[in-house]
Amino acid sequence: MSVQSSSGSLEGPPSWSQLSTSPTPGSAAAARSLLNHTPPSGRPREGAMDELHSLDPRRQELLEARFTGVASGSTGSTGSCSVGAKASTNNESSNHSFGSLGSLSDKESETPEKKQSESSRGRKRKAENQNESSQGKSIGGRGHKISDYFEYQGGNGSSPVRGIPPAIRSPQNSHSHSTPSSSVRPNSPSPTALAFGDHPIVQPKQLSFKIIQTDLTMLKLAALESNKIQDLEKKEGRIDDLLRANCDLRRQIDEQQKLLEKYKERLNKCISMSKKLLIEKSTQEKLSSREKSMQDRLRLGHFTTVRHGASFTEQWTDGFAFQNLVKQQEWVNQQREDIERQRKLLAKRKPPTANNSQAPSTNSEPKQRKNKAVNGAENDPFVRPNLPQLLTLAEYHEQEEIFKLRLGHLKKEEAEIQAELERLERVRNLHIRELKRINNEDNSQFKDHPTLNERYLLLHLLGRGGFSEVYKAFDLYEQRYAAVKIHQLNKSWRDEKKENYHKHACREYRIHKELDHPRIVKLYDYFSLDTDTFCTVLEYCEGNDLDFYLKQHKLMSEKEARSIVMQIVNALRYLNEIKPPIIHYDLKPGNILLVDGTACGEIKITDFGLSKIMDDDSYGVDGMDLTSQGAGTYWYLPPECFVVGKEPPKISNKVDVWSVGVIFFQCLYGRKPFGHNQSQQDILQENTILKATEVQFPVKPVVSSEAKAFIRRCLAYRKEDRFDVHQLANDPYLLPHMRRSNSSGNLHMAGLTASPTPPSSSIITY
C-alpha cells in the first residue's frame, strides 16, 4: 500500500497508528469545522461538538483517535508537532486555521471497500491507548504516524507556514498580499487520505497554500506604532487648538453680535432723534413762513374773495407798499405838472432881447390908445390885472435852470420808484407763490410729517401740479435730502384711465432710472402707497427753475444764457449717445432747474414724462411716429409736431434742438420768439408755429451776430435744414476756443500796424 502526497510517495503497509491518524475526507471536514470553532484556549465549543456527534460513528472514532494522537504528540519532539496545538497557535499568532496547513476535501465517496471490521476498530482503540500512555513517543512499531509523511522543516515554530515543506508550497500564493486566511481548492484531494484495507488510494489529492510574508520587524512595528501615536497626539492637539479657536470665534461672534445689536439700537436712537429734530425744524420753518406770509399780506397784498353773481372769484388786492409807491408816483407826476406850468409862466416873463426891445414899445402905444377909445377904459369900473412884470435876462435863466434841475430830480425819483416797483413785483410773485403753497400744504393729507416707505420723512410741500405733489423729504437710510413726487389718481376715474396713467408713470420711471449724468436729475426710488397713490424719489435741488428766474429777472446776459445752453446741449448729447437714444420732447424753462438759483451756476434737466425712446422697432430713417400729438408745451415745439395728416408726423432729436433755440432766445430777449402773448389754445387755433418760418430779433438788448446765427440754426423751419443734437454739440459758438474768430484776429493784427486802434476793439464780446 502506498501513500502519495505532493512531496513524494511513501511505500509500505500502514500501521494501525497510521490508520488512526489518517483522516477520511469527511473527518477532515469535521476537523476543519471543529478547528474553526475552537476558541483560543484549545477547547472546542458546544456547536463544534454537536457537529462531531452528528457524524458517522466510524468517522467519529477516527477523528477521536487522530486528535488523541495529536494531543499526545504535542509535547514530544519537534519533528512530530501537534496539529491541534498548531491550530490553536495559528489562531492566536498568524490568524491561520488548521485547514491552511493541510486542506482536506470535504467530499469522499462511501465505498464498500472502505468499510472496516470490528477488529480494526479495536486495534485502532488499542493504538489510541498506546498513544495516550506513551505521552509524546512514537506510535507503535508497526508503522509510522501520518505526520511522519510530512517533513516539517520549520520545527515547532509558532506559524504553520514555517513548517511547510518547500516542495508543496504554491508559487502563485507565495507572494500574495491578501489577508492572512487560508485558501483551499474545493476539489483538491487530501494528501492524508489513506485507503483502509488492501485498497490503495486511486487519485492523490494536492494541497494549495496561501503564504504571506513581511519584512516588518518588531522595531519597525514599534516605530510605526510610535509614529502613529505621535500623529494621533498631533491630531488631538490640532483638534484641541481648533476647538479652542472655534470657541474663541464663537465668543467673538457673540460679542460682535451684541455690539451689532448695540449699534443698531444706537442707530435707531439716532434716526429717531434725527426725525425729531427735522420735524421740529420743519415745524419752525412752517411757522416762520406763515408769519412772514401774514406780514407780507399787509405789505404786498392778498387775495380776497369777490362775488360775481352766483359765483365767487379771487381778486388780488395790493398792500401798503404798492399803495405808497403809487402815491409817490402820483406826487412825482403832480410835481412834474407844476413845474411845467411854472415853466410856461416863466416863458411869458421872459425879457425881450436888446434888438427887439424898442419895437414892441412903439407898437404898444397905439394899441393902448385904441383900446381905451373902444372900451372906454377911462370910465371902466373893472380893474384889469397888471401884466406880469418882465424878468431880467439873468433872473429868467436862473429860474429856467431851477426848473430843469427839479425835472431832473423828479425823473430820477420816478426811475427809483419804477425800480422799487419792479422789485416789489418780484417779491409779490414770491409771496403769491408762497400763499398758494401754504394753502395747498394745509389741504394736503401728507402735511403732518409722515414717513413714507419707512424711509422718507416728508418735511414740507415744494409745489403741486395737476395730479401730483412734490415734497421736500429726508432719506433716513442714506442721510440726504430728496424730492418725493406723490402721484395721486382721481378716485372717480375709470380703471382704464388709472391704468394708463400708472403705465405712463412707470414708463417715465424706467426711462429716468437708467440715466446717470451730472446735468440730469437722478431718480432714486419708486414705490406705491395704495392702489391710487404711488411715489417717485428724485434728487433734491435747492434752487428754482429757469422759468421762475425769467419771471423774476425778465432776461439775462449773453454769457449766462450761453452757459445754460452749453449744459443743456451736453445733457442732450448724452441722451442721444446711450442705447436706445431718448428724445426729451418737453424741454422748457420749467423743466430746467438752477442748482444755486442763479443763472451763473449749474443746471439739471428733469421731467421725462413725455420723452420718446428711439428703439430699432419705432425709429427709422425719417424718424419715429409722434403718437402723442397735442401733448407738450406749444411755445417750445417745432412746426412738424403740428402737422395734421393721415399718418402721424415723424420726429427726431431735432425736436429738442428747436426747444434749445426757443429757450436761448427767451433768455436773451425776455420773451418767446413765437406766440409770446398767446395761450396754447390760440397758438393751436391760429397755427402760430406753423407760420413761424423765420425768427425776428428785437433791436434791444444788443446780442452778438454769432448768437443770432446759432439761434437761426436751431430754429430752421424745415427739419432737414435744422441741426441735430450731435451737430449742435460741435457748433463753434458753444466751443470755448472759438470765442475769438480768426477774422477778428487778422483785423486786430492789421489794426496794430496801420492805426492806433486799441486791441480790445477786435474782440467779440458777449
Swiss-Prot record:
It comes from the Eukaryota. This is Serine/threonine-protein kinase tousled-like 1. The modification Phosphoserine is found at S54, S77, S80, S134, S159, S174, S176, S743. ATP binds at L462, G463, R464, G465, G466, F467, S468, E469, V470, K485. Its main location: nucleus. GO terms for cellular component: nucleoplasm; nucleus. One of its GO terms (biological process) is intracellular protein transport. GO terms for molecular function: ATP binding; protein serine kinase activity; protein serine/threonine kinase activity. Signal peptide: none annotated. PROSITE patterns: PROTEIN_KINASE_ATP, PROTEIN_KINASE_DOM, PROTEIN_KINASE_ST. Changing S743D: Loss of kinase inhibition in response to DNA damage. It comes from Homo sapiens. The active site is at D586 (proton acceptor). It is an enzyme of class 2 (transferase). Its EC number is 2.7.11.1. Cell-cycle regulated, maximal activity in S-phase. Inactivated by phosphorylation at Ser-743, potentially by CHEK1.
